[in-house]
Amino acid sequence: MGCASSKQFKRPPGYEEPAVLAAQTTFTVNEVEALRELYNKMSYSIIKDGLIHKEEFQLALFRNSRKANLFADRVFDLFDLKRNGVIEFGEFVRSLSVFHPKAPKSEKTAFAFKLYDLRGTGYIEKEELREMVLALLDESDLHLSECAVEAIVDNTFSQADSNGDGRIDPEEWEEFVKANPASLRNMSLPYLQDITMAFPSFVMHSEAHD
């Protein structure tokens, strides 16, 4: 009897109590439980081991498991807090919390900075910004000329690099975001505010009504 019970209630890899995650994030307990269902769908979509691998992450959030994209890679890497190549449930909830409309702007600002700081130096350099702009355009299927991309990069640096050292530090980035709030528009996902009702219509469309 005891063996059957332990199998029935075996917890998946990286399981954390919803109440604990709710206390540490912007989500409510009910929202965390809804995210658990979403996580289960994602983590069993390809490899089926209860962990989210990069292919599954890209398929769910970026609609493509094979197309290489720097933006998708960066988001995955930042969600993978343990740096072990997979996203566990706790990592998924904590990282996704940053995108909640009610998450503090300071958290969104810090996450966006890390997104652009490709080499983890603590600064955003011109080449890093250029690479991310190109990746974001590619993800959106938008195509700009090389001159237009350079203009975006140069304009950003002319506004953000206040001390003129050729790179953007966290303080400069914070001031830039305050002056240009639209720069964080991709850091809020409105459906997370209604996750218990909206799930899972925003991802995994082909599997949402199994």
From Swiss-Prot:
It comes from the Eukaryota. CDD domains: EFh (cd00051). It is found in: Cell membrane. Residues 31-66, 67-102, 104-139, 148-183 form the EF-hand domain. The record marks 140 as: Involved in dimerization. A lipid is attached at residue 2 (N-myristoyl glycine). Pfam families: EF-hand_5 (PF13202). One of its GO terms (molecular function) is calcium ion binding. Ca(2+) binds at residues 161, 163, 165, 167, 172. GO terms for cellular component: plasma membrane. The keyword Ion transport does not apply. GO terms for biological process: calcium-mediated signaling. Expressed in leaves. Belongs to the calcineurin regulatory subunit family. Homodimer. Interacts with CIPK24. This is Calcineurin B-like protein 4. The lineage of its organism: Eukaryota, Viridiplantae, Streptophyta, Embryophyta, Tracheophyta.
